[in-house]
Amino acid sequence: MRVSAGAFSDPRSLASIETLLCASPELVRLRFAHACCLEDLGRTHEAIAAYADVIEREAGHIGALTNLGCLLLERECADAAEPYLRAAVAAHPDDPVARVNLARLEAALGDLAAAIDAYDAVLAIRPDHVHAHLGLAALHERRGAPELARRHRTLAYARPRAWRYPYYGDMPPVRVLLLASASGGDVVSNLFFDERSVELSIVLADSVRRLDDVAAPDVVFNAIGDADRSAASLERARAICAGLGVPAINDPAAVARTGRVAIMHRLAGVAGVRVPRTERIARIDLRASTLAARGFTFPLLLRAPGHHAGMHFALVTTAGELAAVAATLPRDDLFAIEFVDVRDAAGDVRKYRVVAVDGRLYPVHLAIAREWKVHYFSAGMAESAAHRAEEARFIAEPAAVLGPAGMRALEAIVAALGLDYVGIDFAVDAAGRIVVFEANATMAVYHPPGEAMWAYRRPPIDAVIGAVRAMVAARASAVGSSA
């Protein structure tokens, strides 16, 4: 959980804050807002530096300590996050957000008992804290106490959990109801809604018992994107959408069919596409003989369901490593995933990302690295002008890079999934096939850093954001014209 200075969805907000900072560089609250805005816009490395600057000026700043710790924790850097999150609790012992994040830290460090104690401390301060109850539910499930887990989940959703954001426009707004899941795995959507044209309400779908619990919208945006992590939330979202009877972007029923194993089966017959074999296997059955019987060979990949950004995702090179690697991953079941070697002759791996909005494809980025697990933020693109030039070519002319067959394959994937907003992470193998790493509704887009070297990445991100905003407005207008 982070502390926010506001909801920043537009680079113009950053420019305004920076103008104010030039006039009043000593104001810590402005420096904190600057850091939050950088984070909201996806400029993570700059945000980390900006939060550190706030802490240097005000050592006990709850927002900077919390947000910097959370950024590091989300990147599996628990050791680096630890001093900040512990300092937040030390400086603000009665702050429930600080203690929730301490519980998350303890769990990441492997001390489940300490994590439970930290969540209990939150409930001593605020007995109805939804994230504390849900955190305890997850921990008690891991410890084999399903009744306790069920009790805390019931308490978490004892009342509707909804938030309405302020509207700053002059004309009647488009009223958007965003459905979210407390279990995580939602699409990062803050850039998609401009508070000058959209009145945004957010509700945790699991907490809704009656339609009267939510504000009447013009359109629903279902942000619940992880079918493996949030199946119950998607089912509740489906019922909400059916009851409201307004257009729903990313129909929950369609999202529910995008789990990793389901995607493998659904895309198996698509021409020009290769989807690595994927099976969900109970930890107790995770043996080399079981994997061999199911058609797996080494090396292979293990992944904990419901995690993204490379978290809890590991390469197993030999059967002898299987038990040790599996022991480092959470969950009682894991995905076993076929390892497809997509390195080129020089040893580089290319991971492309495209997003489809209302059926139209948009290039987002290309990350090039030597590691098998490629992520843009760790690929070292800033250090290679040649790699950035290659990415710029892909962004400018994806069809020229991927070829007609590659574009047809991507279009077929989008058509097969039937989502209004969907992302695809993929490589291209030696045969020219699209090798799908992920295809789902959780794909995020972020503005690039402010340096001139990244200027080529800004237009495609703006195009995606503009397309989503236009889609939302069009769906809302369709309701108004038919009324």
Regions found by a protein language model. Name each.
Residues 165-172, 177-290:
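Conserved N-proximal alpha/beta basic substrate-recognition cap immediately N-terminal to
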Residues 314-409, 413:
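Phosphate-binding site of ATP-dependent enzymes
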